[in-house]
């Protein structure tokens, strides 16, 4: 570089000397307007001459550096242009603010759409809003119109209320034959049991329902007999009490008391007489009933004492 600078300086000095010589020659030739310099040559100012000589003497490396410096800002200006074009192609994106529904938790609005994860999330959320109006419409419809299940429930209640009296009537009609069937089944079950228990006394097994009904009728006929006999006895004894005389009469003022007291000795006397008053028949019937009941009791006791299981081998008495 120092040698290049030394070379530049003598050239500059020569130019200055030539220029001064030319300028000094001009006043001498003031008469003529033309310059004595040849046609191909023309005068150049000193500072311009220096610039031209310096440019000519510069090496190729300096020229390349200056060209690179000039091209650098041009490239810097051209580089942002593709980015700006891409932005123009994409267009200005509006700022989207997405808010969650009222019933959900609060969420901050989303302002950036650069990340792919956010885009996918926003797409998933974009599908949700159409479903919300349907869910909101359903409670309105349910409030305006009752559900079909409620209607069916009401209809079932009406059917039950209408069918209840009919069912009660049918049940009352069916209950009577059911009770009779139950009684018959019980009798059928118990009959073989009695036969098995009373195997030692076959007489009890032969006794049927007719015998029991006959005994019940006999007891029903015997029950009113004492009343009728008592009335007839009073009617028969009243004249007898009047014939006895005042000697048997008691000091009691009421006349009805005397016959009642007089009945006792008369009844005793009548009991002694054979075939007297009907009181004898009543006592005979009672004695027969007592005997029959005693016989039945004895039979039942014998059945209870007998073994319930029939013997495997014959037992000799």
From Swiss-Prot:
Residues 100-110, 151-161 have a biased composition (Basic residues). Residues 19-34 have a biased composition (Polar residues). It comes from the Eukaryota. Residues 1-164 are annotated as: Disordered. Residues 1-11, 47-58, 71-92 have a biased composition (Basic and acidic residues). It holds the Pfam family DUF4691. PANTHER family: CHROMOSOME 16 OPEN READING FRAME 86. This is Uncharacterized protein C16orf86. It comes from Homo sapiens (Human). The gene is C16orf86.
């Amino acid at each position: 570089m120092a040698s290049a600078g030394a070379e530049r300086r003598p050239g500059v000095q020569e130019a200055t000397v030539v220029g001064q010589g030319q300028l000094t020659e001009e006043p001498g030739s003031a008469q003529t307007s033309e310059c004595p310099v040849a046609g191909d040559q023309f005068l150049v100012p000193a500072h311009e001459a220096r610039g031209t000589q310096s440019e000519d003497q510069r090496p190729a490396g300096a020229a390349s550096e200056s060209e690179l410096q000039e091209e650098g800002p041009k490239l810097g200006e051209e580089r942002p242009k593709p980015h700006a074009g891409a932005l123009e192609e994409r267009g200005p994106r509006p700022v989207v603010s997405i808010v969650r529904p009222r019933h959900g938790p609060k969420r901050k609005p989303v302002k950036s759409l650069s990340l792919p994860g956010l885009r996918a999330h926003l797409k998933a959320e974009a599908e949700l809003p159409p479903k919300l109006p349907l869910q909101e419409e359903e409670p309105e419809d349910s409030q305006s119109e009752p559900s079909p299940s409620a209607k069916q429930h009401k209809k079932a209640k009406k059917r039950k209320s209408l069918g209840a009296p009919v069912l009660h009537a049918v049940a009352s009609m069916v209950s009577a034959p059911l009770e009779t069937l139950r009684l018959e089944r019980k009798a059928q079950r118990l009959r073989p049991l009695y036969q098995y228990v009373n195997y030692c006394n076959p007489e009890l097994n032969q006794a049927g329902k007719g015998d029991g009904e006959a005994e019940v009728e006999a007891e029903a006929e015997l029950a009113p007999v004492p009343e009728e006999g008592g009335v007839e006895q009073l009617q028969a004894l009243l004249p007898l009490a009047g014939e006895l005389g005042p000697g048997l009469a008691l000091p009691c003022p009421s006349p009805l008391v005397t016959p009642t007291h007089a009945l006792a000795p008369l009844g005793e006397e009548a009991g002694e007489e054979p075939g007297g008053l009907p009181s004898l028949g009543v006592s005979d019937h009672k004695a027969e009933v007592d005997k029959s009941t005693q016989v039945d009791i004895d039979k039942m006791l014998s059945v209870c004492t007998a073994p319930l299981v029939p013997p495997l081998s014959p037992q000799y008495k």
